């Protein structure tokens, strides 16, 4: 149950961070680098959310192409929810380009899982699944 709670806790963390001004946690001295890094995090942020859904599914043997697609859609839709939320937060904004970056991150992670877990079967997820099967039998 702890592993199933991880994506929910992460979603709450995203929500809380989105409620703060963009420079509330950290602001780098070089504003161009600061903006670049924070904008680049959109690509990673929702990919991590997708992976946090995928790991417990893989370990429990419930990761199928369909469940992978479902959690990818949930992760991508949460990106939209996050942008809508940010539109109501002072000093924050919501943009279509941010949603696009969120979705690109999810799609990249989904494609990686699709190729390595379902086709090659040589991913860390496969190793985790096999390890879990050994210790529970």
Per-region residue spans from a language model:
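Membrane-helix interface segments
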Residues: 1-2, 62-70, 95-96
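"…centered on the first transmembrane helix and the immediately adjacent amphipathic helix/loop
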Residues: 1-54, 131
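Small-polar-interrupted transmembrane alpha-helices in polytopic inner-membrane proteins
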Residues: 9-16, 67-87
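Interfacial helix-loop-helix junctions of multi-pass membrane proteins
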Residues: 28, 80-101
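Membrane-interfacial alpha-helical segments at the cytosolic side of multi-pass membrane proteins
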Residues: 45-60, 104-118
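Membrane-interfacial, low-structure loops and terminal tails that flank and connect transmembrane helices
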Residues: 121-137
